[in-house]
Amino acid sequence: VTPPTIPKVTAFITRDDHLLVFRKPFHPGTGTQLPAGTVEPGETPEVAVLREAEEETGHSGYAVRALLTHRLDDMRVYGRDELHDRWSFHLIAPAGLPAIWRHGESDPSSGPDSYIAFDFFWIPLSDAADHLRAENHPALQHLC
């Protein structure tokens, strides 16, 4: 039986030669991550990636520069019985984003009163492959 396919987006947000990433301070085992999420019904991937970037960072004004990759990820290797139809986009950061900041949002998958914090910071694009999971490397190659 083929698992369900869920449309997903990932945002590679750049400013000059740096990439915006985050860590979850209360979940250190999750590592360095990129803004990402699910495409909602009726949304295009382009609209979804902008929404996710705004929701997760707490800032608006991002611009889609390019589609980097579009691939199918089999999440069964991570113990999840689903496929992710993943669209990875290059976004340009708006002017005025700080060097570091914390933002959070509710986490509907963990209950109505749950909250998840994101500590955002910039890393040099040249170092990004050392910080991100291998599944992000193909899209990253289009930035470097």
Language model: regions and residue ranges:
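N-terminal strand-loop-strand
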Residues: 1-34, 46
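Short, cationic motifs built from Arg/Lys/His that form the positively charged side of catalytic pockets
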Residues: 6, 51-55, 121
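Short hydrophobic/aromatic beta-strand or adjacent loop that forms the aromatic wall/cage
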Residues: 6-10, 84-88, 117
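Short, charged/polar surface micro-motifs in flexible loops or helix N-caps
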Residues: 14-19, 27-28, 40-41, 70-74, ...
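Nudix hydrolase/Nudix homology domain
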Residues: 29-32, 98-144
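A generic structural signal for short beta-strands and their flanking turns/coil linkers
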Residues: 30, 35, 69, 83-87
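The catalytic Nudix box helix
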Residues: 34-68
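Active-site-adjacent beta-strand/loop module that shapes the phosphate/pyrophosphate-binding cleft
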Residues: 73-106, 121, 143
